[in-house]
Design a protein with these regions (language model features):
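Internal catalytic-core helix/loop-beta-alpha segment
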Residues: 102-152
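A short glycine-rich beta-strand->turn/loop micro-motif centered on a GG-aromatic cluster
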Residues: 144-148, 168-182
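Targeting/processing segments of secretory and organellar proteins
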Residues: 8-10
């Protein structure tokens, strides 16, 4: 009613109706906002196991806090390999067996066991096209990524999701991610920022 009163001096009812329609559409966009939190590869082998490092261990508490307090839907990814890993291209370039399905190293870290029943995506590559396509079909408007490693699987999934969902707001929480090294972590964040992925410092 206030908005109509403010425009009472405008003689064209068409202009009034167009403005009210625009306001209604804007409010509708707010109402249908749909958020998703994607937890990338928070598995034992990347934290305390074969490929773990101090940087990854240091962000565990931040990740757990984020997961426990988000109002978004939650999904997670699992880096997943078989016993033939040494014969794959990745295995030849990174000859460290890790995240072999069914082993303790493949499992989510104990601190995140409470989300293991949520939707998840097993992937034998850095990025998951299955995840990106699923996000498109679900109609999410905002997607935030956290996890490890920033410079490998986080950036790969952020870019893949962006490619499949160009109009979705993609963000990465830097404080809930860690890389192979601090420098590679920073480099990956800068690269994503350059591709219009929002970085939360």
């Amino acid at each position: 009613q206030k908005q109509i009163a403010m425009m009472a001096d405008e003689k064209s009812p068409t202009r009034i109706s167009h403005r009210l329609f625009a306001t209604s559409c804007s409010e509708m966009r707010v109402r249908v906002s749909k958020k998703l939190l994607v937890v990338i590869d928070m598995q034992n082998d990347f934290i305390t196991g074969a490929l773990g490092n101090a940087q990854c261990r240091a962000v565990v508490s931040n990740v757990v806090k984020k997961v426990n307090h988000t109002d978004a839907d939650i999904v997670y990814t699992l880096d997943t390999h078989g016993e033939d890993y040494p014969d794959t291209q990745e295995g030849r370039k990174l000859p460290v067996k890790h995240c072999i399905k069914g082993t303790p190293g493949w499992e989510l870290i104990p601190e995140l066991e409470h989300i293991q029943e949520k939707t998840h995506f097993e992937k034998n590559t850095f990025g998951s096209t299955q995840l990106a396509e699923w996000i498109r079909k679900q109609g999410y408007t905002e997607v935030e990524l956290i996890g490890v490693c920033t410079d490998i699987c986080v950036i790969s999934n952020a870019m893949t999701i962006k490619a499949f969902n160009p109009e979705v707001e993609i963000s990465v929480d830097a404080g809930c991610c860690a890389g192979v090294t601090p420098q590679s972590h920073k480099t990956a964040l800068d690269a994503m920022k350059g591709c219009q992925i929002r970085i939360e410092e």
